[in-house]
């Protein structure tokens, strides 16, 4: 069983165990499907993605194989433009091993279906989105 904890506001808090959700993501790992995590606002979609990213690293995936962007973060505001997002992500895609791409709150990206469909065509991309 995989249980994580996260440090928040200088106190150690345990995350709610999401074993079933984690197992579902693991079952679809490296499959050419776009994995979409849905739910009401503040229900833990981003946390599930974080737990899964931690699981990937714990199971041998290197950090440089993981791309995570949260489009609610103003640091990534420019990447809401589809051409800029594609130009940013494409050079980060590994050619000889799988690249795991996580887009959090993808709905903020203009024409996001075009971007995720295009990225999903790449043979070494495993794509996960919330929004």
Regions found by a protein language model. Give the residues of each.
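Phosphate-binding site recognition
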Residues: 1-131
């Amino acid at each position: 069983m995989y249980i994580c904890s996260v440090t928040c506001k200088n106190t150690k808090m345990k995350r709610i165990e999401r074993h079933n959700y984690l197992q579902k993501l693991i079952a679809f790992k490296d499959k050419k499907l776009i994995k979409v995590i849905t739910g009401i606002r503040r229900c833990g979609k981003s946390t599930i993605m974080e737990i899964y990213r931690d699981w990937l690293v714990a199971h041998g995936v290197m950090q440089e194989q993981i791309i995570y962007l949260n489009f609610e973060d103003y640091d990534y505001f420019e990447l809401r433009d589809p051409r800029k997002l594609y130009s940013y992500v494409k050079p980060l895609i590994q050619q000889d091993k799988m690249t795991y791409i996580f887009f959090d709150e993808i709905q903020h990206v203009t024409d996001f279906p075009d971007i995720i469909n295009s990225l999903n065509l790449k043979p070494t991309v495993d794509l996960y989105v919330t929004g």
